[in-house]
Regions:
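Structured, active/binding-site neighborhoods that engage oxygen-rich ligands
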Residues: 1-245
Length: 245
């Protein structure tokens, strides 16, 4: 359902928030090529967030901490797609955005295109042509047919190909930022990650009401608030001065 309290009693920042901020920190420092070190540092500093880190990611952090080296594990999980949002704001050409995002290109490209004024139809066309994504179902149909096991139980909602298209669709088929996030939560599955991906795209598409930004910031520790402020001051944001619902 889309009918839930947006800032409820048990709201906390999650692993998705932490690693998204780690990406932003690496970009601000001009060290995106060393972003893996930032992920390890943040994961060690915040080891038990709501949502929890994926098993493959945790094992990768442990190996890198113990040995100083851990190869990319070539995950097809959706974690990479949820933490790439800052890339879509920090680069000003399509090629630079794609190169920086690498395996999480679809999310970053949606943000980049929205920033540059592309219509929702143009963004969908790009996703279909460049990534092979298809969007045959409405949000109402996804609410009935989507779960942790993908659409109709024929997939895996924890991997990119069975969650990123749905997250993009939740943003494109919304009327504003809040509606997009409500779409994402309502379809079920890996809700915090789908919500993170959808929200990052929806910010660039619709903007975020000022009162909603202010409320969300109260859930973050002071150092996270400072990082968000610095990143937005340098690269911009989707902040709207108008109030939300």
């Amino acid at each position: 359902t889309k009918d839930f309290e947006f800032f409820g009693r048990y709201v906390e920042y999650t692993d998705d928030s932490i690693l998204t901020l780690a990406t932003a920190d690496a970009i601000l420092a001009g060290r995106l090529s060393l972003v893996a070190d930032y992920y390890v540092r943040y994961a060690e500093a915040y080891p038990s967030p709501m949502g929890g880190y994926g098993n493959c990611f945790q094992n990768w952090v442990i190996q890198k901490t113990r040995t100083g080296y851990a190869p990319a594990y070539n995950s097809c999980g959706n974690g990479s797609a949820m933490r790439v949002g800052p890339v879509g704001w920090a680069f000003d050409t399509k090629n630079d955005t794609m190169n920086a995002a690498k395996v999480s290109q679809a999310t970053a490209m949606c943000i980049f295109l929205a920033r540059k004024g592309a219509s929702k139809d143009e963004i969908q066309q790009c996703m279909e042509q460049e990534f092979g994504y298809r969007f045959p179902l409405t949000i109402a149909e996804l609410q009935k047919r989507y779960s942790w096991n993908g659409v109709d139980g024929e997939g895996n909602g924890g991997i990119c190909q069975d969650s990123v298209p749905q997250a993009i669709q939740c943003a494109l088929q919304a009327t504003d930022f809040e509606d997009a996030v409500r779409n994402a939560i309502s379809i079920g599955g890996d809700s915090d990650t789908i919500g993170c991906i959808t929200g990052s795209i929806a910010e660039a598409l619709y903007g975020v009401p000022a009162n909603m930004c202010e409320k969300a910031m109260t859930y973050l520790p002071e150092n996270f608030q400072k990082l968000v402020t610095e990143f937005e001051a340098k690269y911009g944001s989707g902040l709207r001065k108008t109030e939300g619902r």
